[in-house]
A protein has these predicted regions:
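Acyl-donor (CoA/ACP) binding surface of acyl/acetyltransferases
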Residues: 1-21, 45-156
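Active-site rim helix/loop that mediates acceptor-substrate recognition in acyltransferases
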Residues: 26-51
Length: 156
């Protein structure tokens, strides 16, 4: 288990994803990736469970800003099933995973499409700070590179 918390009598758990998990369709208009190649490297995956129901997924991978271990950060992402959006579970899950990842790195970051204002608010509620726009940073299924907004939390 990565994290667990009780909120208003409901239990939220973040745990590693297993191959037998029956995950909901948590895709959205922001997930139109196309048939592109997956980035090589280690990708960690987790599920968000509320009162026993899997409501979404999370992932994270290492980002290196220099050759030393101390220069490593984590980049994380989230997807929630539509019926669970707008209830605060995404912000809570991102805060919990961010707390967990900050135990092993000084920096945790997350980015989202410049037009995804809902996720930007969610990240801010989770304690992330807006750092700026990454121009043409992410290729999507429409064949265009999209701008992303970068958010981060640090230990200090």
């Amino acid at each position: 288990m990565i994290a667990a918390v009780e909120v208003d009598g409901r239990t939220c758990i973040i745990r590693s994803r297993s191959e037998t998990d029956n995950c909901p369709d948590d895709s959205s208009e922001w997930d139109a990736w196309g048939d592109g190649e997956t980035v090589p490297g280690e990708q960690h995956r987790a599920v968000i469970v509320v009162d026993g129901d899997i409501i979404g997924t999370m992932s994270w991978h290492a980002v290196h800003y220099g050759p030393t271990v101390g220069s490593r950060a984590w980049s994380m992402g989230i997807a929630l099933a539509p019926q669970w959006r707008g209830q605060g579970w995404g912000s809570l899950a991102q805060r919990l995973l961010g707390d967990h990842l900050l135990a092993s790195a000084h920096r945790v970051e997350a980015s989202t499409d410049v037009d995804n204002v809902t996720e930007q608010r969610s990240l801010e509620k989770a304690g992330f700070h807006r750092e700026g726009v990454l121009r043409a940073a992410q290729m999507r299924a429409d064949g265009r590179h999209h701008d992303l907004v970068m958010y981060a939390r640090t230990r200090d």
